[in-house]
């Protein structure tokens, strides 16, 4: 029996290579079997690309990454033109192989010790008032990357004392207590962790993750920091029903989560999980009404909503769709 080839540090695996060894086999989609995108998913391109080019240049110059690019977000042009970006720390290689996600899998390099300072300087130069910091999963690190998050928050606040910082964290599998101890030294202004989908779809969509772990992470952070809003995001179109998503919303509220994002899953390539349905704007409106009824303080629900989509406006309590 041949052993799997050892991953080389820093080498990105994408598409078929990425999903070759996950519990549920991914059959590459054929064009004729893929659902046609409805009109409501058309993205308007900005009249000018200059702001987009400026942000990309700033990221490249400092060796930084944005999840907007690495995960092929459909809102990249809008957000970059709006002057916002979600920074992805700890490299651009993830230790997990989630087949809905376009971020590369592989064996990551050692964290860049200068990244927190470079990130803080870039944010200052971009004159941002609200930033979202996320990361790949780093199961190779003892603390799951929590110390690097804390270092980034500290350095950002040194150079940008008026800024608001939202962090979108991985699940810190097997090390929740250690991670939360570290983050308690530099708590963010908003704590975000995505459940992504309903629990019965975790095996195919989030191999290596656990629904209850994720709920516990959100609840335990809230218990330590009752004044910091907690937030989570979900995708639709992976085979779930509206009733299943409604139950997830109830679970989130039972675990004291206050902010919600709910959007449409879009298949990054034929090697990723297929879109099983396109959810209509009317259905998103119904789920938004349920979220409001359940007591979420902020709920952004719509086809193009993503976890950090207009996060600054949502944190201000403004309507986001």
From Swiss-Prot:
Its cofactor is [4Fe-4S] cluster. One of its GO terms (molecular function) is metal ion binding. [4Fe-4S] cluster 2 binds at residues 94, 98, 101. Residues 80-297 form the Radical SAM core domain. Its EC number is 2.8.1.8. It is an enzyme of class 2 (transferase). One of its GO terms (cellular component) is cytoplasm. PROSITE patterns: RADICAL_SAM. It holds the Pfam family Radical_SAM. Binds 2 [4Fe-4S] clusters per subunit. One cluster is coordinated with 3 cysteines and an exchangeable S-adenosyl-L-methionine. Pathway: Protein modification; protein lipoylation via endogenous pathway; protein N(6)-(lipoyl)lysine from octanoyl-[acyl-carrier-protein]: step 2/2. Coiled coil: none annotated. [4Fe-4S] cluster 1 binds at residues 68, 73, 79, 308. It catalyses: [[Fe-S] cluster scaffold protein carrying a second [4Fe-4S](2+) cluster] + N(6)-octanoyl-L-lysyl-[protein] + 2 oxidized [2Fe-2S]-[ferredoxin] + 2 S-adenosyl-L-methionine + 4 H(+) = [[Fe-S] cluster scaffold protein] + N(6)-[(R)-dihydrolipoyl]-L-lysyl-[protein] + 4 Fe(3+) + 2 hydrogen sulfide + 2 5'-deoxyadenosine + 2 L-methionine + 2 reduced [2Fe-2S]-[ferredoxin]. Keywords: 4Fe-4S, Cytoplasm, Iron, Iron-sulfur, Metal-binding, S-adenosyl-L-methionine, Transferase. It is found in: Cytoplasm. The keyword Signal does not apply. Its main location: cytoplasm. Belongs to the radical SAM superfamily. Lipoyl synthase family. HAMAP family: Lipoyl_synth. NCBIfam families: lipA, PRK05481.1, PRK12928.1. This is Lipoyl synthase. It comes from Shewanella oneidensis (strain ATCC 700550 / JCM 31522 / CIP 106686 / LMG 19005 / NCIMB 14063 / MR-1).
């Amino acid at each position: 029996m041949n052993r799997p080839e050892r991953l080389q540090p820093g080498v990105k695996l994408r598409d078929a290579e990425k999903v070759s060894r996950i519990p549920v086999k991914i059959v590459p989609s054929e064009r004729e079997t893929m659902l046609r995108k409805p009109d409501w998913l058309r993205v308007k391109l900005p009249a000018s690309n200059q702001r987009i080019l400026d942000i990309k240049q700033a990221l490249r110059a400092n060796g930084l990454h944005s999840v907007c690019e690495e995960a092929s977000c459909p809102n990249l042009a809008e957000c970059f033109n709006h002057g916002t970006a979600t920074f992805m720390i700890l490299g651009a290689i993830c230790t997990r192989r989630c087949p809905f996600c376009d971020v590369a899998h592989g064996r990551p390099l050692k964290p860049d010790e200068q990244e927190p300072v470079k990130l803080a300087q870039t944010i200052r130069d971009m004159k941002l008032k609200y930033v979202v910091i996320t990361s790949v999963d780093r199961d190779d690190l003892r603390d799951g990357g929590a110390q690097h998050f804390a270092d980034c928050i500290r350095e950002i606040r040194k150079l940008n004392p008026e800024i608001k910082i939202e962090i979108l964290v991985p699940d810190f599998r097997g090390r929740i207590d250690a991670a939360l101890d570290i983050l308690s030294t530099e708590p963010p202004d908003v704590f975000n962790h995505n459940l992504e989908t309903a629990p019965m779809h975790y095996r195919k969509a989030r191999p290596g993750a656990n629904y209850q772990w994720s709920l516990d992470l959100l609840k335990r952070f809230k218990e330590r920091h009752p004044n910091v809003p907690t937030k989570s995001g979900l995708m639709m179109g992976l085979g779930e029903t509206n009733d299943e998503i409604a139950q997830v919303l109830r679970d989130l509220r039972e675990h004291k989560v206050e902010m919600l994002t709910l959007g449409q899953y879009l298949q990054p390539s034929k090697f990723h999980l297929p879109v099983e349905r396109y959810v209509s704007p009317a259905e998103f409106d119904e789920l938004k009404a349920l979220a409001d009824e359940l007591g979420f303080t902020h709920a952004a629900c719509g086809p193009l909503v993503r976890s950090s989509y207009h996060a600054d406006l949502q944190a201000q309590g403004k309507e986001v769709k």
